[in-house]
Amino acid sequence: MQDFPRIPLAVLSTPIQKLENISRLLNTNVYIKRDDLTGIGPGGNKVRKLEFLLADAKRKGAEVVFTTGGAQSNHAMLTAACAKKLGMEPILILKKRGVTERKGNQLLEYLMDTDVRFMDTDSYDDIYAEMDRVGKAFAGLVKMAREGQFKPTNNVLYLYSGSAGGLFAIDIELN
């Protein structure tokens, strides 16, 4: 892992804590890794992957991060928090199903002034198609920029949902 670019975002390492009550109830030792103490939003293990993904994006010049998830996605909220901490602009394209009012992660995204867009679908394929559409529109702007018809202001990183870690980036290198 030392060979990969990383920007420390989390307070690490987080403790492992014995859960006394459930250990007693189950008559066995039960422990929990306290990744709620990473120091970013409500925490979670996703901050660890974002340290690498966003470091790579910053190295490549990305200024905007797209990602997706459910209406209350921890991945999306933590991506927004980490991106904001690094001076990047997060854009979340979320499923409209579920809690979409300002509760939980939606409230945190609102407080961070995050650009949140809802799609009325249960299908990630539909959301990825929308991300692809936006990406192709962006690629059209890249072509126009290369032809001297348009000067882009941002590089964009598209970060797919959840813990899968799938990633693709559009890098622009213009003279």
Where are the language model's segments positioned?
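PLP-dependent amino-acid enzyme catalytic core
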Residues: 1-175
